């Protein structure tokens, strides 16, 4: 997708942080997992790092980036025996801590003792990755989500849904956003379109199709985007910020102008760029009507959307502040013969001491030196690490 595909390409914010100013990173304490996702990018599934090794990676990435948040992923992070200590160590750095999980261990613990331990350790939010790509584990994906969401809601734990959009799931984000708006501590969706940098003939999901679907079915336009390493015209992340009425499912999109002001205010207040806006459900409900009214006054064309948004709501508690972020994984540009990936890689991890895009780390810098059946692409290695500031050509 390119910026010209958007309805108003001149208005949208471009989030193009320097490597040092990047507000987000990921940590992989273990590569082991208890399921197999159809589109998983992990090739090495045997490594479990020691707590000391993970601490060293946290220290290193905190020196390389001005972090607001670290997301712990894997593998499946709940399999690491010291996950609670890892969370506590991240929090000791004054950094927000999110955990991306397939939810299996949490669902197998109906009393929630393990979840309670993560909360006590300081976990700020859970990203729940349960989708149709795991249907071999969850016979009823919707039932699994509802069960886990209810447990998180009861404990007032903020949570998002993480999904991979396959050809069978295209156009479904609006329905998910409306369906889960009823949960007070649900704050949005992180989606990845199914693509792969290796197979040349794989049928790929297009980001532009999801953009049109959200405009048609939820009535929202994106407020910001992240370009690729090759061109600012490329749209590799598409980010929506909006308020949603949980009673009616009507959404009110936050304009790029208000999104820009919000981000600048956060930067001035904290000295860091905002990768996420920490969920504050009651506060956001209280200010929702006022923010939407102010946005409408500045952009009068939004009056119809504002009226629909308030329908069946209250001026004091009209809606909830949510996000949708859609990512396009790395792929080879057939014309330039170069690897296209997100500018600055918002999801970078530490791989063998180097800041590395997590979704291609196994292809360019595997933990064990090689993957046996996959040869390290030296051209990609040079391209990626020069773009990430780790290699000077």
Model-flagged regions — what are they?
Residues 5-9, 31, 40, 96-98, ...:
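N-terminal capping/interface segment
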Residues 1-17, 246-393:
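Radical SAM enzyme core and accessory elements
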